[in-house]
Amino acid sequence: MSTEATPLRFLVVDDTEDIRDLMSRMVVRLGHLADQAADGVEAVEALTRHDYDIMLLDLTMPRMSGEDVVRWLRENPDRGVGLDVVIISAWAGEQRAVLQELGVTTVLPKPLRGQQLRDLIEEKKTRTPR
């Protein structure tokens, strides 16, 4: 339903398949593209192959946590150029200070609401004209 000529590209990272699918469907319904990763290792693999505009990232996952993905991005800044990292987690409160130190400015509670996603998209479009 977006009137934007160039869709944003999202990477949706969550170890719960239903949540990943739900967030991806929300993104696609708004006229954008969504790739999925089931954990941090898959996220890093995707980030090395593609450029994304926004990453919706869970914190607590097997193999590699969301926090570790953010650390990897800080160590590999060429992979995160223009990428907005948005933490989506029910448990982010106690990690907020660490996330802020790593440069994460947006932390949203699960479940992600449609209006929150629309707001993220509008903010990104405002900052990054396409």
Could you say what each language-model-derived stretch is?
Residues D21-R29:
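Charged docking surfaces used in two-component/phosphorelay signaling
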Residues Q36-I54:
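Acidic, metal-coordinating helix/loop segments flanking the phosphotransfer/catalytic sites
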Residues D51-D53, D78-D84:
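His-Asp phosphorelay/catalytic-motif detector in bacterial-type signaling
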Residues D58:
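Active-site residues of response regulator receiver
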Residues M61:
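Receiver (REC) domain active-site loop signature in two-component systems and cognate sites
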Residues V86-I88:
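Hydrophobic/aromatic residues positioned on beta-strands within the core alpha/beta folds
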Residues L112-I121:
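C-terminal output helix
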